[in-house]
């Protein structure tokens, strides 16, 4: 078990270059981190191939940590298990990563869970053989576009990590594709990722060769397949946001039709709760909404200065009774057991005269079962298989009426989803 964090920052060097390059890098790094004015420890990972580098590091007072796996996956695993710092900075020790950038990483340590030295954002730059540049650009372009990611340099290994975000992912897959895996998993947990410009100059000797491209490509292909499943899973922090902006016309229409109906029901009400908000864009359309979700990753993703977000459960809403004019619960109850506590909790938080807005799919129609079957074929990692309670319009109307609510409006989306607005009379 890894000890609790003690050092503020661990600077982990890997892939050492020539002896004189390593000597200069260590000297520069030691001087630079001294200005951080916090406890800082330098480490060198040892994969067993460079005993001379280990000797240089120890002579300079650098701690050496064993690296069990190969590639950057092995480096990251060694960094997590072999250090105790709250922040971890990784950089290659062959001269391609300028240590002078370290203060810039440190200045952004609280801004994101991962800070990347990026070659492919404005003011970033790279100097490398043309074929490496083409391969690197293509790799990053495919991952960015196909996985719908907001960052540009997924293969840069010059990074700062917050241990709190990195440690739960360890051990990561060995190999260089671990860089993409860690980055995407962190983003899918709702953590922030920040890129800062870096100028990258490839070393004259060493590095990639044509002979390494095939095994590297196979590693990246395997990683891409895993990350494709994750990015299109409900486990991804931005699942609802991606659906709102989907490239699939029908999915985009459905999401935006729901958004229009719900925002119309809310109107100009100021005290509004969205119980089970996920990463809905309704929070941007109606910024007065208090968003609550059981999934912490969704709450993290939707954080904005001034926004009111709560990590909580629909079975025990963490709010006072009669705290809201409108309580909204959309696309939630079908994922939960049919428990009367859910309805009583939602109604408890509404003022007399306020309204409950409840949305779910309608299993009483023929349209939704057909849509669900087709959706399951097209997107097997989507929501459909998680619907454990099947409601119909008749069941919901009867349930809400029996609880003292008056049905005011009912809207449908393609006859497959029902959205009800019901008034709390007393």
In which residue ranges do the predicted regions lie?
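A conserved acidic beta->alpha catalytic loop
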Residues: 46-53, 95
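Short, acidic, metal-binding catalytic loop of nucleotide-sugar glycosyltransferases
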Residues: 28-38
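Short beta-strand/loop segment that forms part of the nucleotide-sugar
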Residues: 37-48
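Conserved N-terminal segment of class I S-adenosyl-L-methionine
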Residues: 224-320, 326, 343, 358-359, ...
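Acceptor/aglycone-binding surface of glycosyltransferases and processive sugar-polymer synthases
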Residues: 68-82, 87, 99-172, 176, ...
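Hydrophobic helical membrane-anchoring modules
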Residues: 1-7, 13, 18-20, 24-27, ...
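A short glycine-rich, Lys/Arg-flanked "PGG" loop and its adjoining helix->strand segment in the class I
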Residues: 340-352
């Amino acid at each position: 078990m890894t000890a609790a964090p003690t050092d503020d920052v661990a600077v982990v060097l890997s892939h050492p270059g020539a002896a004189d390059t390593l000597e200069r890098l260590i000297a520069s790094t030691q001087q630079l981190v001294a200005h951080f004015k916090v406890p800082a420890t330098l480490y060198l990972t040892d994969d067993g191939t460079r005993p001379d580098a280990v000797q240089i590091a120890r002579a300079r007072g650098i701690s050496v940590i064993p690296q069990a796996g190969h590639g950057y996956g092995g480096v990251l695993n060694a960094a997590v298990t072999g250090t105790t710092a709250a922040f971890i900075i990784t950089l290659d020790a062959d001269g391609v990563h300028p240590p002078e950038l370290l203060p810039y990483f440190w200045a952004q340590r609280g801004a994101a869970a991962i800070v990347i030295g990026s070659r492919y954002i404005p003011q970033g730059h790279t100097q490398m053989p043309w074929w490496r540049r083409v391969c690197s650009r293509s790799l990053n372009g495919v991952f960015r576009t196909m996985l719908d990611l907001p960052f540009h340099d997924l293969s840069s290994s010059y990074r700062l990590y917050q241990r709190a975000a990195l440690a739960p992912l360890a051990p990561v897959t060995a190999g260089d594709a671990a860089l993409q895996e860690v980055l995407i998993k962190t983003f899918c947990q709702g953590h922030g990722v920040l890129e800062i410009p870096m100028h990258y100059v490839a070393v004259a000797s060493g590095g990639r060769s044509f002979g390494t491209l095939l095994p590297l490509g196979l590693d990246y292909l395997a990683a891409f397949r895993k990350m494709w499943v994750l990015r299109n899973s409900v486990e991804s922090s931005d699942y609802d946001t991606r659906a709102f902006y989907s490239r699939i016309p029908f999915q985009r229409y459905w999401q935006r039709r729901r958004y229009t109906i719900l925002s119309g029901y809310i109107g100009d009400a100021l005290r509004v709760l969205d119980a089970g908000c996920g990463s809905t864009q309704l929070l941007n359309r109606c910024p007065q909404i208090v968003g609550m979700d059981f999934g912490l990753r969704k709450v993290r993703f939707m954080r904005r200065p001034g926004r009111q977000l709560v990590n909580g459960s629909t079975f025990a809403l963490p709010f006072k009774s009669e705290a809201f004019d409108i309580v909204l619960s959309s696309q939630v109850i079908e994922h939960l057991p049919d428990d009367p506590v859910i309805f009583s909790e939602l109604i408890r938080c509404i003022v007399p005269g306020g309204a409950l807005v409840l949305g779910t799919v309608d299993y009483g129609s023929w349209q939704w079962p057909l849509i669900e079957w087709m959706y399951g074929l097209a997107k097997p990692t989507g929501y459909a298989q998680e619907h454990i309670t099947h409601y119909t319009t008749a069941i919901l109307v009867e349930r809400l009426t029996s609880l003292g609510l008056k049905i005011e409006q009912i809207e449908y989306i393609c006859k497959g989803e029902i959205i009800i607005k019901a008034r709390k009379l007393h």
